[in-house]
Amino acid sequence: MRKINLIVVHCSATRSDRRFSVEDLIACHNARFGFTGYHYYITRDGQMYQTRHENLPGAHARHYNQHSIGVCYEGGLTPDGDYADTRTREQKAALHALLKSLKVDYPDALILGHRDLPGVHKDCPCFDAKTEYSQL
C-alpha cells in the first residue's frame, strides 16, 4: 500500500455553464495520460465517482503523485472563463463527506489545494481548500 501524505483538491477548470461529465473527464485524461489522473471526481449534482484506485499513483500533481490522492470537482471557471469557486451546494457537501472519509483512511495526510503545492503557479481549485478543510 502507498504511503499517502497529501490529499490534493482540484477543479476541472471548465466553465460553470457547460457540463463536463465523468465520461468527458475520463476521455480527456485517457487521451493525455492513458488513464484517469484523479482518484475521485465530483460533478455539479454532487455525484462522486472513483475514477482511479487509491493504491495507484495518479497524474494530478507533478512531483507529488506518488504519495497523494487527487480529488477533483467539476467547474472552477465562470461562464466567461474567469477562475472562481463554482462549487454547488451539492458539490460542497459531497467534497466535505469524501475528504472526511479519506482522513479516516489517511489520518496523517494534509488536505490542500493544487495551488498550495510548492512550485505550482495555478489558481486550482479556485478556493482555499487548506483553510476550509483544516479541521478535518
Predicted feature locations:
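A short, polar/proline- and glycine-enriched secondary-structure boundary/capping micro-motif
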Residues: 20, 59-66
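Short, conserved "active-site rim" segments that organize catalytic pockets and cofactor/ligand binding
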Residues: 1-56
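Basic/polar, cationic surfaces and motifs that engage anionic cell-wall
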Residues: 1-8, 12, 16, 44-47, ...
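Short amphipathic alpha-helices and their capping/turn segments at secondary-structure boundaries
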Residues: 55-62, 100
